[in-house]
Amino acid sequence: MAKRDYYEVLGISKDASKDEIKKAYRKLSKKYHPDINKEEGADEKFKEISEAYEVLSDDNKRASYDQFGHDGPQGFGGQGFNGSDFGGFSGFGGGGFEDIFSSFFGGGRQRDPNAPQKGDDLQYTMTLTFEEAVFGTTKEISIRKDVTCETCHGDGAKPGTSKKTCSYCNGAGHVAVEQNTILGRVRTEQVCPKCNGSGQEFEEACPTCHGKGTENKTVKLEVKVPEGVDNEQQIRLAGEGSPGVNGGPAGDLYVVFRVKPSETFKRDGDDIYYKLNVSFPQAALGDEIKIPTLNNEVMLTIPAGTQTGKQFRLKEKGIKNVHGYGYGDLYVDIKVVTPTKLTDRQKELMKEFAQLNGEEINEQPSNFKDRAKRFFKGE
């Protein structure tokens, strides 16, 4: 099935501004969000809206889409950030097929080594308690990352000196190398090892960063954790990644959350579950029992005749949706607890109850000692 035009999906014109795109996305995503709209097809509609917004809200992706449509050179599909491999924080990089092809055979489209390039994105894993995730918090984190050198301001040259044409590649930024391969001896082009592709070298390198233009430092950042975040969810801190190259923008920092389980509740999305043990008399006669919620304690009415497995729903007593779509519910699961130790009087009452109910009880010993007594009595 052919994909619909992204502008048509959001119901906007092709010259719509970023604010108009965002406004249309918010309106439609709220209408078709799976947590709100339970109609058939709402989930697919929401995915289509999210995919359209991801492309049209990004200047580069939008420009490529306007030129090539869905069959653009990169394709579009709402992949987003891949948070499957966590562990502290790390950079993201790697070239595509064209880079591999070009490095092996040479030729192909050459990148301008002096063009502005966005810095690498970084990732940090933050551990939260259940309460911190539910109510939100602000935490300070420390990460090691590359920052712009304060001495040379990212230039790489010693202040007061200038750059000159690289003597190794004569300013080309790349050098020809011959290699023995399975196809025979091939001539390839590689990035100049002296100037790293810039085509320039320093008269004298910066004494602080040794020509890199960056320093690796420990940086402290304040992270505001929104209410309702769940395990494996993430937030993006724009511009807090590695510094850009040649005046390009800095990358972003993605904070991925690890949420510890609660000792009281079990979480499922925005809903929470609480297990409540009730005694046999409470279940049979009914009662009012005080139970915990996220914010306080409330009285729960247990109707007479309540059985194990009965579930009560307390609307909007769950967790606030992180996207602002209301609150989840609190579900109370009932378990009727059978008494294990009874006094003689309690046993008499239970037998009397059984007789009144027309039941014959063949009482069984509860432990080895009782079984032994009955054995020697010949019972």
From Swiss-Prot:
Keywords (alphabetical) are:
Chaperone, Cytoplasm, DNA replication, Metal-binding, Repeat, Stress response, Zinc, Zinc-finger
Cofactor(s) named in the record: Zn(2+)
CR-type zinc-finger residues:
136-218
Residue sites binding Zn(2+) 1 per the record: 149, 152, 206, 209
CXXCXGXG motif repeat windows: 149-156, 166-173, 192-199, 206-213
Primary place of residence?
cytoplasm
User: Does Nucleus appear among the keywords?
Assistant: no
Q: Extract one GO BP annotation from the record.
A: chaperone cofactor-dependent protein refolding
Stored PROSITE patterns: DNAJ_1, DNAJ_2, ZF_CR
The reply to whether Hydrolase figures as a keyword in the UniProt entry is: no
Where is it located? Answer: Cytoplasm
Q: Which GO terms describe its molecular function?
A: ATP binding; heat shock protein binding; unfolded protein binding; zinc ion binding
Task: Relay the domain remarks.
Answer: The J domain is necessary and sufficient to stimulate DnaK ATPase activity. Zinc center 1 plays an important role in the autonomous, DnaK-independent chaperone activity of DnaJ. Zinc center 2 is essential for interaction with DnaK and for DnaJ activity.
Functional summary from the UniProt entry: Participates actively in the response to hyperosmotic and heat shock by preventing the aggregation of stress-denatured proteins and by disaggregating proteins, also in an autonomous, DnaK-independent fashion. Unfolded proteins bind initially to DnaJ; upon interaction with the DnaJ-bound protein, DnaK hydrolyzes its bound ATP, resulting in the formation of a stable complex. GrpE releases ADP from DnaK; ATP binding to DnaK triggers the release of the substrate protein, thus completing the reaction cycle.
What is the protein named? Answer: Chaperone protein DnaJ
Q: Can you name the source organism?
A: Staphylococcus aureus (strain NCTC 8325 / PS 47)
